[in-house]
UniProtKB/Swiss-Prot annotation:
UniProt source species: Parasynechococcus marenigrum (strain WH8102)
Residues holding L-glutamine: 51, 242, 244, 272, 275, 311, 313-314
Catalysed reaction, written as an equation: hydrogencarbonate + L-glutamine + 2 ATP + H2O = carbamoyl phosphate + L-glutamate + 2 ADP + phosphate + 2 H(+)
Name of the protein: Carbamoyl phosphate synthase small chain
The gene coding this protein: carA
Keyword annotations of the record: Amino-acid biosynthesis, Arginine biosynthesis, ATP-binding, Glutamine amidotransferase, Ligase, Nucleotide-binding, Pyrimidine biosynthesis
Enzyme superclass (EC): ligase
Length: 383
């Protein structure tokens, strides 16, 4: 549905493709990598997830904004996606928690959107040709001018975006900011486990799940070094999700390598953190054609499958991980890429998907308990 005060907008891809629709949200122009998310719900969590920094997100579900936005479902204080591409904008929002329409929220936060375009055709283009840079614009410029702009935009490969979304100051996170799903947890320890989380673009839901599993979390900037981490006397270190190319996050790789070599602490990485752990162990990463962004990706090896929430454009090359030191424990069953690994001799593991969901299924929440169990074992032996 067109915006009530509709203005024409263009989406121009770097290959010359032009789609014309209606502007919504903030009026203006923005360049980013065009990707797609196949989830039917959770657009507020997606748009505020720092892992989407630098991207124009196409939603495959045909209508957006049905439930508006609320104060609980944000993964950060503000949106991190650069733009929104939708087939249709809902004419009204209806939900008991709704505090604002998606359109107004996007306008307030300066988030540019385009609707009324053939998202099915666009997703087929991205699926067949891969993610590509594009520009959304409602500022009146011609498609030819926009094409010239987007062709000068940098590729996602080689970009360290984690440094742009990370906190600049340490902070503590010890109580959940919202009520979550049925946690099904055992009694918390009398003394919470001290966890240092390295913020490459961390989601609030991850912090909430760590707390729900009995952790007191100190969040440090993405450029924290080993001395800074160890000064907090952690019982475990968590490497967070985040945007961009993992191979460009030199400080994170150096820290993970130092932790592996000198700290002998439980290490747990999710998404970008998983990739950084893999790189620190000697592995290599590569860019996926169009990435994994959705809520129903099956992952496993044999005997048990987890339906998972995913959001990443890079993956670890299975052949690059050092054997037998590192074991691949889960594969994405859609394309057989590495979904999780563990170290055979150290309390270290990484998973490519999102056990905290938000949005998505909770099949993989037990990985937080797995991390806590490693810290409990270390505490029991006086580590």
């Amino acid at each position: 549905m067109p915006h009530p005060s509709s203005r024409q907008a263009h989406l121009v891809l770097a290959d010359g493709t032009v789609l014309t629709g209606d502007a919504f949200g903030h009026r203006g122009s923005v360049v980013g990598e065009v990707v797609f998310n196949t989830g039917m719900t959770g657009y507020q969590e997606v748009l505020t997830d720092p892992s989407y920094a630098g991207q124009l997100v196409t939603f495959t579900y045909p209508e957006l904004g049905n439930t508006g936005v609320n104060g609980d479902d944000q993964e950060a204080d503000h949106p991190h996606a650069r733009g929104v591409i939708a087939r249709q904008l809902a004419p009204c929002a209806s939900n008991w928690r709704c505090s604002e329409s998606l359109d107004n929220w996007m306008e307030r936060h300066g988030l540019v959107g385009i609707c009324g375009v053939d998202t099915r055709a666009l997703v087929r283009r991205l699926r067949d040709g891969g993610a590509i840079n594009g520009v959304i614009s409602s500022d009146g410029r011609s498609p030819a001018d926009l094409l010239a702009e987007v062709r000068h935009a940098p590729s996602m490969e080689g970009l360290n975006l984690a440094s742009q979304v990370s906190t600049t100051e340490p902070y503590e996170w010890s109580s959940p900011c919202r009520v979550g799903f049925d946690q099904r947890l055992k009694q918390h320890p009398d003394l919470p486990y001290r966890v240092v989380a390295i913020d490459f673009g961390i989601k609030r839901a991850i912090l909430d799940r760590l707390v729900a599993h009995g952790c007191a979390v100190t969040v440090l900037p993405s450029d924290a070094d080993l001395d800074t981490v160890m000064s907090h006397q952690p019982e475990g270190v968590f490497l967070s999700n985040g945007p961009g190319d993992p191979a460009a996050v030199d400080s994170g790789i150096d820290l993970a390598r130092s932790l592996l070599e000198r700290a002998n602490l439980p290490l747990f990485g999710i998404c970008l953190g998983h990739q950084i752990l893999g790189l620190a162990l000697g592995g290599k990463t590569f860019k996926l054609g169009y990435g994994h962004r959705g809520l129903n990706h099956p992952c496993g090896t044999s005997g048990q499958v987890e339906i998972t929430s995913q959001n990443h454009g890079f993956a670890i090359s299975a052949d690059s991980l050092p054997e037998p030191m590192v074991e691949v424990t889960h594969l994405n069953l859609n394309d057989r890429t590495v979904a999780a690994f563990q170290h055979r001799h150290q309390p270290v593991f990484g998973i490519q998907y999102h056990p905290e969901a938000s949005p998505g299924p909770h099949d993989a929440d037990h990985h937080f308990g797995r991390f806590v169990a490693l810290m409990a074992d270390r505490r029991d032996v006086g580590g």
